[in-house]
Amino acid sequence: MSISVNDIIEAQAHIGTLKSEAHPKTNKYWAGVVNNIAVINPESIIEQIENAKKKIQAAKAEWKEILIVSEKKMYADELEILGEKYGFNYLNYKLPSGFLTNFETLKKRIESMNTMARFVDTENYLSLTKKEQLVYKRKLARVLKIYKGVKGLTKKPELVIVLDGQMMDNFINEITKTPDVQSIIIAGTNFARRWAEDSIILANIWSHKSVDFILNSMFS
C-alpha cells in the first residue's frame, strides 16, 4: 500500500524539533518553520520510507540478518512487539559496546544466554534448591533483558536500522567502521551528520504514533 501525504500528517511524522534545536544539515528536508517548529516535507518522508522498504525487502530476499537498535525507553515494549511480529532482530535496551566491531565476543554472550535458557528446562535445573533456582532465573532475566531480541542471531548483522540517530551517535561510529554493514538511520531534525540519501529517514522520532507508523510502513 502506498503512503500518502495525509498518512504522514495524520501520523504526525512531519513534526521536527524546535528550530533552535534543529541542525542546519537537515534543513534541506524541511517544508518550513511553523510556530518555531521545523516542519519536515512529507514528500521527503514518503520517499525515504519507500527507499528503506526496498532495502529491507532486498535484504530479506538475500536472507541477510536485519537488526533494529534503539535505546529509547519509551519505545522498548513496542519495538519488542514489532520484532516478534515481523521477525527481525532487535536491541531495545542498553546497547552493548562493540556489537558490530567486536561481534564475535558478543556472539559468545548470546550463545551463553541461550545455553542458560535451555538449562531451565532440564532436570539438572530442577535438582537445584529453590534459592539456587531463584538466583539463576534472576541472572538469566538480566541477560535476557539486553539480548533476548538477538537470541537467534548467529552472524554479524548485515543491515542495521537505528532509531534516533543523534541519540545513537556512538553506535553510528561503529557503523562507519564496518563498511560491509548496510544501514538505515531514522533521525529527527537534530541529526548532526550527513548520511546517504537512500539510507536515512528524517522524521518525528519523539512520538509513539509516528515511530509506529514509520516502522510498520517499512516492514509491511
Predicted features and spans:
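Extended, charged alpha-helical interaction scaffolds
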Residues: 124-179, 184
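Long, charge-dense
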Residues: 77-139
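Residue-level signature of catalytic and energy-coupling elements of molecular machines
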Residues: 12, 68, 160, 214
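Short glycine/threonine-rich loop/turn motifs
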Residues: 171-220
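Short hydrophobic alpha-helical runs that function as membrane-insertion/retention elements
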Residues: 65-69, 89-92, 161, 182-187
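Short glycine-/polar-rich loops that comprise or flank the Walker A/P-loop
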Residues: 63-64, 88, 155-158, 179-182, ...
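N-terminal, positively charged regions that mediate nucleic acid binding
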Residues: 1-65
